[in-house]
Design a protein with these regions (language model features):
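C-terminal cap/substrate-recognition region of VAO/PCMH-type FAD-linked oxidoreductases
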Residues: 94-190
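FAD-binding glycine-rich core of flavoenzymes that anchor FAD
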Residues: 1-108, 168
Length: 190
């Protein structure tokens, strides 16, 4: 089922339990959320960095990303989820589950947030509580050529040395202490 056209986002004002949340269509990509939601709502969810991955799959799987060390995973900020299910007669029903629900709806809310593969219906919309606003984020990127048998290229031995140095750097420079400026470091090797 293609949800790529479900890309709207807005401040929810109609549903009392979700008032003040930002409603995000499940087809919204990580890139569009970061690019559009931050100027619109003053925050971006702490989700992934793959620009083409959409909220429907990423959020349902937990939503780990570059800002997760600071703000948790995206599922930590989901207050509600709208989905379409089929009843026993094959009739489509739109269901809204929220963090305040109990019983079957509460269990469904839990399962849709990374607890069971997200295959309980077609998620059409997420409702996110705002994360802390970040005025600046530092990003550093290093690229290495992969051509072997050249002085600047990475052969197997150079790659092994790079990975070992990379791991040693993060092991000594990353801090779990909340007041340490290095507690916000995030490493990604692609």
């Amino acid at each position: 089922i293609d949800t790529s056209l479900l890309t709207e986002f807005y401040f929810e004002e109609r549903i009392p339990a979700l008032r003040g949340c930002v409603a995000v269509g499940s087809g919204s990509s990580n890139w569009s959320l970061d690019r559009m939601l931050y100027p619109f709502a003053g925050f971006a969810p702490p989700g992934g960095s793959c620009y083409s991955v959409a909220a429907g799959g990423h959020f349902s799987g937990g939503g780990y990303g570059l800002m997760s060390r600071l703000d948790g995973m995206v599922v930590d900020h989901i207050a509600g989820i709208e989905l379409v299910t089929l009843d026993e007669k094959g009739v489509a029903n739109t269901i809204l589950v929220t963090e305040n629900d109990t019983g079957e709806k509460g269990e469904l809310f839990w399962a849709l947030r990374g607890g069971g593969g997200g295959n309980f219906g077609v998620v059409t919309r997420f409702y996110l509580r705002p994360c802390q606003r970040r005025n600046a984020v530092k990003l550093s990127t290093l690229s290495f050529p992969w051509e072997s048998n050249t002085e600047s290229g990475l052969d197997t031995d150079k790659l092994a040395a790079l990975i070992k140095a990379y791991g040693a750097y993060w092991e000594t420079h990353n801090s779990p202490l909340p007041d340490d400026p290095n507690n916000e470091l995030f490493a990604l090797m692609r």
